[in-house]
Amino acid sequence: MSKIVKVIGREIIDSRGNPTVEAEVHLEGGFVGMAAAPSGASTGSREALELRDGDKSRYMGKGVLKAVGAVNGPIAQAVLGKDAKDQAGIDKIMIDLDGTENKSNFGANAILAVSLATAKAAAASKGQALFEHIAELNGTPGKYSMPVPMMNIINGGEHADNNVDIQEFMIQPVGAKSLKEAVRMGSEVFHNLAKVLKAKGMNTAVGDEGGYAPNLGSNAEALAVIAEAVKAAGYELGTDITLAMDCAASEFYKDGKYVLAGEGNKAFTSEEFTHFLEDLTKQYPIVSIEDGLDESDWDGFAYQTKVLGDKIQLVGDDLFVTNTKILKEGIDKGIVNSILIKFNQIGSLTETLAAIKMAKDAGYTAVISHRSGETEDATIADLAVGTAAGQIKTGSMSRSDRVAKYNQLIRIEEALGEKAPYNGRKEIKGQ
């Protein structure tokens, strides 16, 4: 009953108004799975390739008709008649047929959309929720947890048009007793932050991920206004709510230095920027820092891990690009202590699950993440619960492309009850 009988690819629109790939996988018995590939703004150089058409007469060259053509043509032909429950087998067929190291023939956007749609169709054929099926694929059936959210409430860097260098300033409601309560706490801080910014005469327009993008005088000022909002919402900073940052440092790495516009265009060495971050962690309860240096600055990361690695969570995103080969090298060298998981960086569900497992086996944490270009597809919510990853990063408390994931988590928590605990601070490395 889980044999693939039809595969359909189409071009749809993401949250930035750019095209992306959506796939449908149809099985015998009428079961259907549908999924869409997300898209990033600040991308690691070693990510699997997102195939764009380059035809300037359509969508400024960002069309995905080539990738859609791959779904409707060679991919569909290769997987027809195959068992959708054999996720690893389906993914291997597509990867082998593509034949490139970085999926540049069909595009990771094509392969991923079919990979996720296959998982959804297989879950439907088994009468399961997607998170249940993912837990089985992961070799951890029935083992679930609700993730602690990292809520990106102030956007800077590539995600906003302002003078803040650090790309994301996030809150983590570690003191919540449930995911539902964590969402409420996040929402209340988000709305209080709007009041704080308005009172200072600042802009409350939102960036790509639904957070505010005010023109602040410095990076530290972003932390200060969030601290004010947490207090105004009636919560205690450091106890109820902790802070996290995504530096996306590759975006301001120039000629071997970290050049920060928000700090008067000061140029920092790797060591100096590490101590700049360390100073911020002493002033504010920052428990997680992502991409604190450039993706190629491995010596710098070794130093940063030595200085901060036993105190806080250091997350590799552009550094590892959800790639087990690169992650293994990082683990062997003791670089950072956590990985950000974005399944479009690697391009299939099977490879994503392998990266999560490798990280956990090495004592690293795994943070499941959206991209800045998203759709209503909420698969990452099921991925976070089904792998018991422990943390999720899916934007702020606005924009339906972000909220879709929180709402799916609320539904899953309701369905699972005590089978999926919300573990709060314990999920964060170093806490």
Swiss-Prot record:
Phylogenetic placement of the source organism: Bacteria, Pseudomonadati, Pseudomonadota, Gammaproteobacteria, Enterobacterales
Subcellular localization: Cytoplasm; Secreted; Cell surface
Positions annotated as active site in the UniProt record: E209, K342
GO cellular component terms attached to this protein's record: cell surface; extracellular region; phosphopyruvate hydratase complex
Chief localisation class: cytoplasm
Pathway: Carbohydrate degradation; glycolysis; pyruvate from D-glyceraldehyde 3-phosphate: step 4/5
Gene Ontology biological process terms from the UniProt entry: glycolytic process
Gene that specifies this protein: eno
Binding of Mg(2+), residues: D246, E290, D317
Top EC group: lyase
PROSITE patterns (alphabetical): ENOLASE (PS00164)
Binding-site list for (2R)-2-phosphoglycerate: Q167, K342, R371, S372, K393
Keyword Iron-sulfur: no
EC number: 4.2.1.11
Catalytic reaction(s) noted: (2R)-2-phosphoglycerate = phosphoenolpyruvate + H2O
Functional note: Catalyzes the reversible conversion of 2-phosphoglycerate (2-PG) into phosphoenolpyruvate (PEP). It is essential for the degradation of carbohydrates via glycolysis.
Homology family: Belongs to the enolase family.
Name of the protein described by the UniProt record: Enolase
GO molecular function, one term: phosphopyruvate hydratase activity
InterPro entries recorded: Enolase, Enolase-like_C_sf, Enolase-like_N, Enolase_C, Enolase_CS, Enolase_N
Oligomeric form and interacting partners: Component of the RNA degradosome, a multiprotein complex involved in RNA processing and mRNA degradation.
Cofactor(s) listed in the protein's UniProt record: Mg(2+)
Keyword annotations of the record: Cytoplasm, Glycolysis, Lyase, Magnesium, Metal-binding, Secreted
